[in-house]
Structure formats: structure tokens, C-alpha cells
Regions:
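N-terminal beta1-alpha1-beta2 submodule of the flavodoxin-like/Rossmannoid cofactor-binding fold
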Residues: 1-91, 153-160, 164-167, 171-177
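Catalytic His-Asp charge-relay segment
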Residues: 5, 98-100
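Short, acidic Gly/Pro/Ser/Thr-rich loop/turn segments
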Residues: 12-14, 109, 141
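Mobile beta-alpha loop/short-helix "lid" or hinge segments that flank ligand
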Residues: 35-46, 125-145
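Short, conserved loop/helix-junction motifs that constitute active-site signature segments
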Residues: 90-95, 123
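Short, glycine-/small-residue-rich phosphate/pyrophosphate-handling segment
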Residues: 100-139, 154-157
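An extracytoplasmic/periplasmic, membrane-proximal ligand-sensing/linker region
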Residues: 148-150
Length: 177
């Protein structure tokens, strides 16, 4: 089965990013595309099994059709988590796979700063942002005491369109110049 790989730069596996990953997995299922994910927090050097998880990340990224980078914007103080995680990957690891960057938290004005902060690592990894980055801030979520948070209809539509485009790009042959 083909799959997309999502890398979450959130400082916690119990965050809105986790709900976003569940949503993405459900939306990719009709395409027969699985979603594998890695949380930056799982790769901290002092965590048991971190080196095995890093090896697994390298292998799954290598075989993924596309990569989703989901990380807090710079003001959330955790964007450094994603940058550090990307530094663990060997040069060229992304092999020109189409990437979608999803910035979470903060506000949309910070998205260009997030893109710039990751640019050097993405270049080293041969990554290419294939689509315009997407921002999902607190106002893009609906919260209720009776159920898990969910995305607003407009946010779902934007993400659904981006996944359609990413899926199409993943099927195209890569031309490297």
C-alpha cells in the first residue's frame, strides 16, 4: 500500500496535531493511501528506542509518496523541534518528494517565518514545497466539552483540496534539473 508520511513537530503527541493526523488519515483512505506519522518528541535522544525510531523514519520517508510537515509556527516556540528533527535526516533523504507544510497555532502572519526557518534543511534534504503552505490556527478548530476538537468546514475544504493536489503531484514523475 502506498502512503504519505506526516512528521509532527508538536511538543506533545496529545495535541491538536494528533486530531489533525486522524483527520488526514480518514481523508486519504478513499485514495487507498495510508498515513504514517512520526512525532518529533519521540526522537529525543534520551528516549528509549529513539535511534530505532529514527532509522524507521528514514526508511519510511524514503518510501513515502509525499511528506506532510505539521509544526507549530515560530511564536509557539516549538518550530525548532521540526528543524532539529529534519537535521537528523541524511542529506537528500526527501528525494524531491512533494511536501506540504502545515503551520499550526499562532497566526497566519507567521507562516512565512516558518517557511524561512525550514528552508535550509529542506534544501539539504532535497525537499520541495509542492503547494502553498497552510495555516491552521486556534480559530480553525471547533471545541466542545462533549467531543474531540474538529476542524471548521472552511479549513476542511482547504485541506481536502491540498490533499487532492498532493496526491496528483505524488503520481507525477519527478524531474530534477
Amino acid at each position: 500500500m502506498c502512503y504519505f508520511h506526516a512528521i509532527s513537530g508538536s511538543p506533545s503527541t496529545l495535541s491538536r496535531n494528533s486530531f489533525l493526523l486522524q483527520w488526514l488519515e480518514q481523508r486519504l483512505a478513499p485514495y487507498d493511501i495510508g498515513l504514517r506519522s512520526t512525532h518529533a518528541i519521540e526522537l529525543q535522544p534520551f528516549k528509549s528506542g529513539a535511534s530505532d525510531r529514527l532509522t524507521d523514519l528514514i526508511n519510511t520517508v524514503r518510501d513515502a509518496q509525499a511528506i506532510l510537515l505539521i509544526t507549530p509556527v515560530p511564536s509557539e516556540d516549538w518550530a525548532g523541534c521540526m528543524k532539529t528533527l529534519l537535521q537528523f535526516l541524511p542529506a537528500g533523504a526527501l528525494q524531491y518528494r512533494p511536501l506540504l507544510l502545515i503551520g499550526t497555532g499562532g497566526n497566519i502572519d507567521e507562516l512565512p517565518n516558518l517557511e524561512r526557518s525550514l528552508d535550509r534543511e529542506l534544501t539539504r534534504l532535497n525537499g520541495r514545497l509542492a503547494l502553498s503552505s497552510i495555516h491552521i490556527g486556534p480559530k480553525n478548530w471547533v471545541f466542545s466539552t462533549s467531543r474531540s476538537p474538529w476542524l471548521t468546514a472552511g479549513t476542511e475544504l482547504r485541506l481536502h483540496r491540498a490533499l487532492n493536489q498532493l496526491h496528483s503531484l505524488a503520481l507525477e514523475p519527478v524531474t530534477v534539473s
